[in-house]
Amino acid sequence: MKASYLVLIFISIFSMAQASSLSSYIVTFPKTDNMATDQNSIIEDVKKYVVDIGGKITHEYSLIKGFTVDLPDSDQILDGLKERLSYIESEYGAKCNLEKDSEVHALNRDHLVA
């Protein structure tokens, strides 16, 4: 009985540690007229690359071409994604934007009424 509690606690701690080691990023693809290939195939290629490097697509946008991804906190992984997006931009003329996802407010929090 005590061993099962110990295993449950270990799994919980491992899960929390693993979840805290992810960062969320937004990847968008503005419409470009001078592209050498189909934009949708480029987006699918980037999504496949993200999954291959250990990322997870958490949301796909419908109003704009893009998605949100959770990536492991690693400079090497982030640099690899940046290099891939840069290559796609130079090779196919597809503009790619990558930004860290963060909370945004219309007003300074000091103006909020309690």
Curated annotation (Swiss-Prot):
Disulfide feature: none
Query: A Gene Ontology molecular-function term?
Result: endopeptidase inhibitor activity
Which residue ranges run through the membrane?
none
Top-rank lineage group of the source organism:
Eukaryota
Additional remark text? Present with 319 molecules/cell in log phase SD medium.
The entry assigns this protein to a family as follows:
Belongs to the protease inhibitor I9 family.
* UniProt name for this protein: Uncharacterized protein YHR138C
